[in-house]
Structures are given as structure tokens and as C-alpha cells.
Swiss-Prot record:
Its EC number is 6.3.2.-. GO terms for cellular component: cytoplasm. Pfam families: Condensation. The gene is ACTTS1. Pathway: Mycotoxin biosynthesis. This is Nonribosomal peptide synthetase ACTTS1. Keywords: Ligase, Virulence. Gene clusters encoding host-selective toxins (HSTs) are localized on conditionally dispensable chromosomes (CDCs), also called supernumerary chromosomes, where they are present in multiple copies. The CDCs are not essential for saprophytic growth but controls host-selective pathogenicity. Although conventional disruption of ACTT2 could not be accomplished due to the high number of the copies identified in the genome, the high sequence identity among these copies of ACTT2 is likely an advantage for RNA silencing, because it allows knockdown of all copies of this gene simultaneously. NRP synthetases are composed of discrete domains (adenylation (A), thiolation (T) or peptidyl carrier protein (PCP) and condensation (C) domains) which when grouped together are referred to as a single module. Each module is responsible for the recognition (via the A domain) and incorporation of a single amino acid into the growing peptide product. Thus, an NRP synthetase is generally composed of one or more modules and can terminate in a thioesterase domain (TE) that releases the newly synthesized peptide from the enzyme. The keyword Methyltransferase does not apply. The keyword ATP-binding does not apply. GO terms for molecular function: ligase activity; phosphopantetheine binding. The lineage of its organism: Eukaryota, Fungi, Dikarya, Ascomycota, Pezizomycotina. One of its GO terms (biological process) is secondary metabolite biosynthetic process. Belongs to the NRP synthetase family.
């Protein structure tokens, strides 16, 4: 490798030339790959490190998204070409480097792990007779990206194929999934190469390295001064064995005309109303007037070029803290949620781990509940005559489990 190319590709590591050569050789050995196939190496984001650390503590932990997708062509009688579909996926992986990324430990450099981008890794792409027989939680190989695509052709009268995608949250979030499917459809139609270069996940890592982390952390310390752990079950005589679980409860009419009118009047969002509702639930079950919980920030509004087009986990868990004794009405509470959310958004890159450490929580959890808000509509991507529809999606609770584990 030439030193000039090394400087350009591996600049986010901040190593000198002698250190870099030894580092790359070591990483190749760790990952069981050849040095020649490594395109880039850079640090992980705080969220990625959080996931990797959680998995290392519990081998049973599964921080993955599983989705079943129906892929069709519009005209009756047309059939999906599996070979072409596989080639289209390869184009998507070529375009988005996070889909060619593996991970290796990096304790000796003050980090838990680093991510290694490979030039042309093997893609886990299989054809089966029944995708429902593919078990969840398969073991991914260390030397290939952490996802599996399983294709099942449908009967001729049903048209198309079913594709099951199981993918680790270390390399994707919900927003990214939509970009990935859209580009897959474009690639199958032969249109993806017409697009300009895509922004890469390394752009996000580079941005994080320029952030004033001390100033952001100080904001959170000020915002959380005097906060106490807000845990459910609380202190109201509820003595139950501690377990980890998640439940999904459909909320009907969440976008009713009455609620929409209420939000317009106060100039708030439906999510602010959901936050306010959960705040009141926490007061009920903890007996506390000063409560806090987590919520997910997409971080797609960061000042990074085309951040909305980056495939990779930009999400972060932020803290909502409310002192209910200072608020007089439900309207005031909802408006307080909005003001706090706007201010928190200016400091959204601070990791929850850094906040815990700065607060000297000493192994305690600040909260054990989190609120995420997304519509349960079916995602459908139609590009140039090919349609990909997500009709089973098991990603909804994963983000909360990542950050609360």
C-alpha cells in the first residue's frame, strides 16, 4: 500500500505512517482477511460500540432487525430474475460501504472496537423454498458483513419473490432500511449507476470527531442536575422479579382530527403528546414528580452533506427529563416536551454512556423505559417498474433494547 493512499483512506484513525502499517496488518489478522481486501478502517460510533459491548456481555443478546419483503414486477407474467436481483444487491453494497463492513476489537487503542470496510466481501445471499423456516439469530461470520438475505420464489400466479432480510443493528437503523430497499429496486431496474456518489457512514464518524463533546456533555450535566434514577416498577410496593421484555400496544386514532387540531393549536407534534403521556404514566408508577426516560433521535438533521442518504446507524438515545411539580396543565406539559426536544436536538450526538459516566451513576441505570414513535404503515418502494413491500417487520423495539441493556 502506498503511504499517500493510506493517509486518505485511514485518516480517521489519526495514526502516524509507521503505526498505521502495523495497525492494518494487525486488523487483517484479527478479522481473518487479507490486507489487500481492506478498503478502510475507522472507529465506531458510540451507538455501535454500545451494541458490540452489549453483545460481548451476553451471547444471547440479539440486536437485529428481521423483515420480510415482497418483491414484484407490475406486469402479469413477468418474473423476478434471481441472478439479476443478487447482482443488484451487490451494486447496493458497492454503493454503501457500511454493507461491506465487519468489526474487530481495538482495546489497545482506547476503543472497544473498530470497523473494517472490505472491498468485495462475500454476500450472504441464499435461495430457499420457505423463508419462514429460516431461524432467527443465526451466527454471522466474522469475516463477512452481519446480514443474511434469503430469497423464496413464489408460485407463478402469485408473482415475484419473498425476501427475508436479517441484519445487525450495528450496521443499520430504520431510516437506512428504506434507503437500502429503494436503491435495491433502482439497481434491479438498471438505474442505480446513474446516481451520484452516495454519502458514506465514515462521513458521520468524521463529523463526530469534529464535535465539541465537552460542551455537549456539559449541557446534559446541567439539564440532569439532581436527577434520580426513574425505574419501573417504582417504589409503590411493586415487588417483581427483574426481567427484560418488550410489548407492543397498538394505539388507535393516534392521528385523529381532534388530536391533530390540538397539536396545531399548541404548535407541537404528536410525538410531543406521546412523550407527555408517558411522563404522566411514569409519575403514576414511580411516585416521582421528577421523571426521565429515553427517546430515539434519528440524527438525520446533523450538518453533514446528504445525511438523510447515509446508510448506517445514526440514531442516538436522548434523555427526556421533566419536573412535573412546576407545570400547571397538560398543554404546558406538551409544550415543555417540544421545547426540551428542540434544545436536546442541538446536543444529540452525546452518547448515553458518556452521560452515565459523567453523572457518576456507578452501575445504576438512569431510566429503564424509552419511547419510540413510528407509524405501523407498510413501507413500499416502487422504482422504475419494480416494487418492494415490507409486510412483516420486527425492528420496532430493537433501539430501546440496545440502549437500555
Amino acid at each position: 500500500m502506498s503511504s499517500d493512499s493510506e493517509k486518505g483512506r485511514f485518516s480517521l484513525l489519526g495514526l502516524s505512517e509507521p503505526e498505521l502499517s502495523a495497525f492494518i496488518i494487525h486488523k487483517a489478522s484479527q478479522a481473518n482477511v487479507e490486507v489487500s481486501v481492506i478498503e478502510d478502517v475507522y472507529p465506531c460510533s458510540p451507538m455501535q460500540e454500545n451494541i458490540q459491548m452489549s453483545k460481548s456481555r451476553s451471547h444471547d443478546a440479539q440486536y437485529r432487525m428481521v423483515a420480510i419483503n415482497h418483491i414484484t414486477l407490475p406486469r402479469a407474467g413477468d418474473s423476478i430474475d434471481i441472478h439479476r436481483l443478487r447482482h443488484a444487491w451487490q451494486q447496493v453494497a458497492d454503493r454503501h460501504s457500511i454493507l461491506r463492513t465487519i468489526f474487530a476489537e481495538s482495546f489497545d487503542h482506547g476503543r472497544f472496537c473498530d470497523q473494517i470496510v472490505l472491498e468485495h466481501p462475500d454476500i450472504n445471499f441464499h435461495e430457499v423454498s420457505d423463508v419462514n423456516q429460516t431461524p432467527d439469530g443465526i451466527s454471522f461470520r466474522q469475516d463477512s458483513p452481519a446480514y443474511l438475505l434469503t430469497i423464496m420464489p413464489l408460485e407463478l400466479d402469485e408473482r415475484g419473490v419473498v425476501c427475508r432480510i436479517e441484519i445487525d443493528h450495528t450496521i443499520i437503523d430504520g431510516w437506512s432500511y428504506g434507503i437500502m430497499l429503494r436503491d435495491w429496486a433502482r439497481a434491479y431496474a438498471g438505474k442505480l449507476r446513474e446516481e451520484g456518489p452516495a454519502p458514506q457512514y465514515s462521513d458521520y464518524i468524521a463529523f463526530l470527531q469534529t464535535e465539541n463533546h465537552e460542551a455537549h456533555l456539559q449541557y446534559w450535566l446541567n439539564a440532569l442536575t439532581g436527577v434520580q434514577p426513574c425505574l419501573v416498577p417504582g417504589t409503590m410496593g411493586l415487588h417483581v422479579k427483574r426481567t427484560q421484555s418488550s410489548r407492543s400496544v397498538p394505539v388507535l386514532n393516534i392521528r385523529s382530527p381532534i388530536l391533530q387540531a390540538f397539536c396545531r393549536k399548541l404548535k407541537v407534534t404528536v410525538f410531543n403528546v406521546v412523550q407527555a403521556a408517558w411522563t404522566m404514566v411514569l409519575r403514576k408508577y414511580t411516585g416521582m414528580d421528577d421523571v426521565c426516560f429515553g427517546y430515539v433521535a434519528a440524527c438525520r438533521d446533523l450538518p453533514i452533506g446528504n445525511a438523510e442518504e447515509i446508510v448506517g446507524p445514526l440514531i442516538n438515545m436522548l434523555v427526556c427529563r421533566t419536573r412535573l411539580d412546576s407545570l400547571q396543565s397538560t398543554s404546558e406539559l406538551v409544550q415543555a416536551m417540544q421545547r426540551q426536544m428542540i434544545e436536546n436536538g442541538r446536543h444529540q450526538t452525546t452518547s448515553l454512556g458518556a452521560i452515565h459516566h459523567a453523572l457518576k451513576m456507578r452501575g445504576l441505570r438512569l431510566f429503564n423505559t424509552a419511547v419510540n414513535f413510528r407509524s405501523f404503515r407498510r413501507d413500499k418502494f416502487q422504482e422504475h417498474g419494480i416494487a418492494i413491500e415490507v409486510f412483516e417487520d420486527r425492528r420496532n423495539m430493537e433501539v430501546s433494547k440496545i440502549s437500555l441493556a
